[in-house]
Amino acid sequence: MKQQANLIRAGQVIEHDGRRWTVLKQQIITPGKGGAFIQVEMRDLKTGNKTNERWRTADSVERLVTEDKDYTYSYMDGDNVVLMDPETFEQLILAKDIFGDQFAFLQDNMPLNVKLVEGDPVGVELPPHVTLEVTEADPVVKGQTASSSYKPAMLSNGVKTLVPPFIEAGERIVVRTEDGSYVERAKD
């Protein structure tokens, strides 16, 4: 389905130069002279390569229709991730590369949203937040409480993140699955 370039949004799947791309970021740029244009960062669904593309706001782009389907994470099978449809109990096997950096945040029985184009999986959405345990945290340096300085910490999944000075090793925190950043202390 054709649409104007200025209607492109992150998460959409488009076809460009005979290949399928998922849109990572889009930005409307209005230079001082001349017309506005859209700068889009996108990832090739087959190779995983990223590229930037620019279109005038009036240009048309082929947007592919995606179907969202809910699955539950089951287990790892080598370099593949096995998901299960909670309604039909059918299994879907995906390469772990489709998850990108978010792979580290997968947890047993985690609900996932898989984007399909013509039956082919093209992307996976994790829940926006996940609760993890802090395994290592640097000690607090006295005198730093006046500023909003964060300290490095290691999470139970092996991801490093920055946490406020009051967080200690052994505590559970909520982090964003998008970038691994600290949200809050877990309330459990």
Swiss-Prot record:
GO terms for molecular function: translation elongation factor activity. It comes from Gluconobacter oxydans (strain 621H) (Gluconobacter suboxydans). NCBIfam families: efp, PRK00529.1. It holds the Pfam family Elong-fact-P_C. PANTHER family: ELONGATION FACTOR P, TRANSLATION ELONGATION FACTOR KOW-LIKE DOMAIN-CONTAINING PROTEIN. It is found in: Cytoplasm. Keywords: Cytoplasm, Elongation factor, Protein biosynthesis. HAMAP family: EF_P. Belongs to the elongation factor P family. Involved in peptide bond synthesis. Stimulates efficient translation and peptide-bond synthesis on native or reconstituted 70S ribosomes in vitro. Probably functions indirectly by altering the affinity of the ribosome for aminoacyl-tRNA, thus increasing their reactivity as acceptors for peptidyl transferase. GO terms for cellular component: cytoplasm. The gene is efp. This is Elongation factor P. One of its GO terms (biological process) is peptide biosynthetic process. Pathway: Protein biosynthesis; polypeptide chain elongation.
